Amino acid sequence: MKTIIYNNIKKACMTLCLVGSLASCNDYLEYKPTAVVDEQQAFQNPDEMVNSAYAMLGDDWYGYPFNLWTYGDVASDDALKGGSGTTDTDYHQVEVFTTLTPTLGHLDELWYHLYIAVSRCNRALVALQDNGEAKLGAETTKQRIAEVKFLRAHFYFKLKMVFNKVPWIDEDAYRNNSQEQIKNDEYTAEQLWDKIIADFKEAYDVLPATQSQGGRVNKVAAAAYLAKCYLEKGWGDGYEGSTGANFVNKEDMKKVVEYTDVVKNSQYGYLEDYGDIFLPEHHNSKESIFAVQHSNYEDDHTTYGRGNWSNVLNGVWGIWSCGWDFHKPSQNFVNAFKTHNGLPQFNDYADENAHPVNGAPSSQKWDPRLFHTVGMPSFPYKYEGAYTLTTANSRTPNTYGYYCSMKEVPQRSKGETYNSPWQSFAMNDYVIRYTQSMLDRTEALIELDRFVEARQIINDIRQRAANSINKHISYAANQCEISLYPDTYFQNKEKARLCLRWERRLEMGMEHERFFDLRRWGLLSTTLNNYFKKEQNDEYNGQKYAQYYKGAHFTPGKNEYFPVPYPQLYYIPGLYSQNRGY
């Protein structure tokens, strides 16, 4: 009996120990690791999910710059890559085209990170749809959905501009887990624009004209972006032979005018001095309709700050401690600022190379915006005499010449956000500024034969440039000359287009628009192939540079868009198709 009782007690104890062990194991299995986001919990906080979508606006890097400086400028006649030589980063392929292939890693990085941004937006939309009203209330939820639709359209705009054939993945695809079943040629170019426009239109219909929190998108920004979309859509599909002057859709141009009416009659406007636009103390001024916000570590008390890492390579050699001297203005671009009697030298601007020298005025005069845009030897770097540029401030002059870009970096005395081993700046990135929107409007007005209105806008912009001498660039005053266009320059569409296109190049120079402008107008192959022939023979003080352009060639019907990255094509074989010619 004692043995039986003892055995029963022993079995009971063992059972209790086993149950206890299972409970302990279960506790360990249910342990929630730290520093990891729980998806279900995250979806319970829809406003934080919206913030995560906003955070992607500036979550880029020089290998995948969301401002597209390499694809908008380096791929055009405005800029050279820069750096220590042609093998410094893989962007050399982008500026010569002949070696450009789908295996370029930077293309895959850009595609991948832009789709991370799209995914953030889709997750935020699901969180808002499921938990928004309970957590935020109906009205705030409606507005947050509109904001996220704006952000998603913004990221798709970037994807469409670079890659053309991209899969439209929305919140329904995320819910259904069908992202890997959506083809990138499911929609035509026009249909894809319509999808992007629909997101911006929903944002426009809901958002207020002003927001109490800086950085949040608003109705006017949506209107400006809608105008940009209709402008791109209204010229054709982007490929030469099916885009340009013979393919302009007048109804789309009317939409551009309609939405820029909203911008024109809003709280935004021209900043009085052109140079102020690119100084950090004037961030979020009336010129700034939509900009990616950046900060330094002193502002947000973090180690690195929310710096602009897309421009991390673009500091000037020898001026900045980590200036790597990328994004170099071309001689052709500098020549475009030449004036005669205050007006552009349309026909002979590139016949002879020239550059101003500080303190040595000549008969050649210049549009004053040159001195706000391009850093040149003998002139103060960004208005500060203590940092005067010399030929030593070019890292590889025998390859990339002696000019430097000034708009995207602050004055040297203002310092950087972070400077070792990489350098970032707290400069906001303009996505749309007021003048750009007015140039969009002007382009549409010309296509609608409204030349008087178009001339007035361009002359307003030129008058601002004329007023932008004494405050910052008085040292170049005797080298500047700019006049307003007389009505004879706007007597017909051909003349008006020439004035608009020239003005856009000067006003928006080095702001990552040029390649896309030339594509829209159907002028890429003629412009770039002529540029390659000329720039390879250019000299600066007797020294040739840009010899690598001898191997450059733009192929129409192919190079208007960049290739779909190889890893994306072969992640799910057969799902995606390649762009023409690659």
Which residue stretches match the model-derived regions?
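Bacterial N-terminal signal peptides that target proteins for export
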Residues: 2-13
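Membrane-proximal, proline-rich intrinsically disordered regions
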Residues: 25-72, 105, 565-582
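Long, intrinsically disordered, low-complexity segments
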Residues: 28, 46, 101, 114-117, ...
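Short, surface-exposed recognition loops and adjoining beta-strand edges that mediate ligand/DNA contacts
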Residues: 35-40, 44, 63-86, 169-172, ...
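Conserved, well-structured interaction surfaces
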Residues: 47-60, 85-163, 181-194, 198-216, ...
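Short coil/turn linking the two alpha-helices of tandem helical-hairpin repeats
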Residues: 160-162, 167, 211, 229-241, ...
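Active-site beta-strand/loop architecture of penicillin-binding DD-peptidases
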Residues: 385-433, 581
